[in-house]
Design a protein with these regions (language model features):
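Class II aminoacyl-tRNA synthetase catalytic cores and aaRS-like
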Residues: 1-168
Length: 169
C-alpha cells in the first residue's frame, strides 16, 4: 500500500467507469476489434519477465488478461508488478486468443482500484480447510464460485417466500 502511495497512486477510494461486464465480454470473439473497459478482483496472477497474465472476476464471470510492458509503459508495468491476488483493477483493451485458445483481454491501460489488505488463498488449492471455510465465509464466497451461486439461489428462494407470504398474509 505504501509503495503505491509513494508512486502517487491512491490505493483506495477511486471512482471507475466500468462499461462492460465480463459476461458481456465473453460473448465476443477476438475478431470484433472492439475496445472493452471492465473491472474486477484479481483471482489469478503470474508474471514472466516483461509480460503478465492474470484472471479477474466480477459478479457476472471471469476472464483472463494479458499485460505487456511495451504496451502499457515501464512506469505502469512497475505499478502492475505491485498488484496481487484479491486486488481490484480496472482494465481497458482488446480481445485476442492465446496459443491454448483461451479468450484473453490484451490490456492497453489499467487502473488500481483497491489494494487487498489480507492476501487471498492461492487459486490452485483454494480453501481446503473446512473450519476456515466456515469461519471466514467471505473468503469462501470470493474464492469458490459454486458457494456464491448457492448463496444467490438461497437469497432468491427467501425473497420469493417473503413476497408470497406478504401477498397472501
Amino acid at each position: 500500500v505504501e509503495e503505491l502511495r509513494e508512486a502517487g497512486i491512491e490505493p483506495y477510494g477511486r471512482k471507475y467507469e466500468k462499461i462492460n461486464d465480463i459476461e458481456e465480454i465473453n460473448k465476443y470473439d477476438e475478431t470484433c476489434g472492439k475496445v472493452f473497459k471492465t473491472a474486477g478482483r484479481i483471482i489469478a496472477y503470474r508474471r514472466m519477465g516483461k509480460n503478465g497474465f492474470g484472471q479477474i472476476q466480477d459478479p457476472t464471470g471471469k476472464i483472463q488478461y494479458y499485460v505487456k510492458k511495451d504496451e502499457v509503459g515501464e512506469e505502469q508495468y512497475e505499478i502492475y508488478k505491485k498488484m496481487g491476488l484479491g486486488d481490484f483493477i480496472g482494465l481497458e483493451g482488446k480481445l485476442f486468443r492465446t496459443n491454448t485458445g483461451e479468450l484473453t483481454l490484451r490490456v492497453d491501460s489499467f487502473e488500481v482500484l483497491s489494494k487487498n489488505v489480507r492476501p487471498l488463498p492461492e487459486k490452485f488449492h483454494g480453501l481446503t480447510n473446512i473450519e476456515t471455510r466456515y469461519r471466514q465465509r467471505y473468503v469462501d464466497l470470493v474464492m469458490n464460485r459454486e458457494v456464491m451461486e448457492t448463496m444467490k439461489k438461497r437469497f432468491q428462494i427467501i425473497r420469493f417466500f417473503r413476497s408470497y407470504l406478504e401477498k397472501h398474509g
